[in-house]
Structure formats: C-alpha cells, structure tokens
Amino acid sequence: MLFRSHMSGSDAYVNVAGGIKVSEPALDLGIVMALVSSFKNRAIDEKTVIFGEVGLAGEVRAVSQAQQRVNEAVKLGFKTCILPGVCLKNIKKNDKIEIIGVNNVQEAIKLI
C-alpha cells in the first residue's frame, strides 16, 4: 500500500535553487521525498542525494545521465544516493557512496 496522507487539505510550495531546470523529470523523486519527510516529521540525511522520475502510479522511472549524476554527487560529498532501480545496471560501483535503487515511491519512503 502506498503512503497515504491527509495532505489534500494542505498547500505545498517548492523552492528550487537558481540554475536548476524545473522541467527536469529527475527532480520528481527528490521533491516527493522532501514532502513526505516534512509530513512525517523525519529528516532525510543531509548527505543523501535523491533523483528519479515519478509516474502517476508511483513507479520510479529511469532518468538520463544517471552515472554522471552519481559521479557529481560523490564530488559534492554525498554518501548515499537513492535512484531508480532500473538505473542500477548502468552504475559503476563506488566505495565512496552507497547506491540504493528503488522501483516505486513506496520503496523510497521506507528508507526514511
């Protein structure tokens, strides 16, 4: 069962840092996780990076340039990366960052 909340009566405002393309579908999962984190009052570790496109049924879809995104996360000092499970086959192992693949929003929510 997917995460269900009583957020329908709430407004959510998302502020995106300058220079980030808001049309980038890889932002979806990070935004969903930020909203769930706020609603559940549980912080996501500041050394965790999250990316992936989210479909209407809650599935987490692949995004382009997954390896480059992971490489950049390592350069920026992130220790954990949550990404689409289908991208795992194209990601090289790296001892500097833990890579966690998720196939749907429910799996991602269990991580916080």
Language-model segments: residues:
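Peripheral, non-AAA+ core regions of ATP-driven protein-machinery
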Residues: M1-I112
